[in-house]
Swiss-Prot record:
Protein name: Tetratricopeptide repeat protein 36
GO biological process: central nervous system neuron development; memory; negative regulation of proteasomal ubiquitin-dependent protein catabolic process; negative regulation of protein polyubiquitination; tyrosine metabolic process; visual learning
SUPFAM superfamilies xref list: TPR-like
Family membership noted in the UniProt record: Belongs to the TTC36 family.
Modified residues (Phosphoserine): S152
Keyword terms, alphabetized: Phosphoprotein, Repeat, TPR repeat
Source organism per UniProt: Rattus norvegicus (Rat)
C-alpha cells in the first residue's frame, strides 16, 4: 500500500491535475462527526435530525421556503446544535440572503467550537461566500480551517487561491501531457 507520502507522489504522477497531497482515502483519517451530538437528549436529537433531513430534501427539490421552515424548527428544538445553522445557511444563500447565511455560519462555527463536520462545512461555505465577495484573505483563512478538519475541497480551493501553486500544477500537467502524448513522426 505504501506510506501516505508514497500515495501522494503516485497521485501527483498519475493525476497531475489534482492538487499535490490530495489523496483519495486519506481524508478518512479525520475523526468523523465530532459534533458532540451526545450532549443532547436523544429524542430531541432524533427529531432535530429528522427535521434537518426534511429541510435538505426540500432544498434539493427547490422548495426553499419549506427548507427554511424545517431548519428553523430544528434550531428551535436544539438551539445549541451547529448542524441546523449550517444547513439553514445554505438555504439562505440559495435564496440570496447572504447576510443571513453569514450570520448562521458564524453561529455554527461558534457552537461547534471549530471542530467536527458542521464546523468543516461551515468554514467551506463561509470561505466560498468570502471568495465570491472578493475577500480572498478571509476565504483563505476559512479554507485553511476546513482543510485542517479534513476537507479535500478546501485544499483544492487553497491551491486555486495560491497563484504559484496553480502555476506549478499547470506546468506539471503540461509536462505530463507532453510525456504521455505520442510523438509525431516516430
Amino acid at each position: 500500500m505504501g506510506t501516505p507520502n508514497d500515495q501522494a507522489v503516485l497521485q501527483a504522477i498519475l493525476n497531475p491535475n489534482t492538487p499535490f497531497g490530495d489523496v483519495v482515502g486519506l481524508d478518512l483519517e479525520e475523526t468523523e462527526e465530532g459534533d458532540e451530538d451526545g450532549v443532547f437528549p436523544q429524542a430531541q436529537l432524533e427529531q432535530s435530525k429528522a427535521l434537518e433531513l426534511q429541510g435538505v430534501r426540500a432544498a434539493e427539490a427547490g422548495d426553499l421556503h419549506t427548507a427554511l421552515e424545517r431548519f428553523g424548527k430544528a434550531i428551535s428544538l436544539l438551539p445549541e446544535r451547529a448542524s441546523a445553522y449550517n444547513n439553514r445557511a445554505q438555504a439562505r444563500r440559495l435564496q440570496g440572503d447572504v447576510a443571513g447565511a453569514l450570520e448562521d455560519l458564524e453561529r455554527a462555527v461558534t457552537l461547534s467550537g471549530g471542530r467536527g463536520r458542521a464546523a468543516r462545512q461551515s468554514f467551506v461555505q463561509r470561505g466560498l461566500l468570502a471568495r465570491f465577495q472578493g475577500r480572498d484573505d478571509d476565504a483563505r483563512r476559512d479554507f485553511e480551517q476546513a482543510a485542517r478538519l479534513g476537507s479535500s475541497f478546501a485544499r483544492r480551493q487553497l491551491v486555486l487561491l495560491n497563484p504559484y501553486a496553480a502555476l506549478c500544477n499547470r506546468m506539471l500537467a503540461d509536462m505530463m501531457g507532453q510525456l504521455s502524448a505520442p510523438s509525431n513522426g516516430r
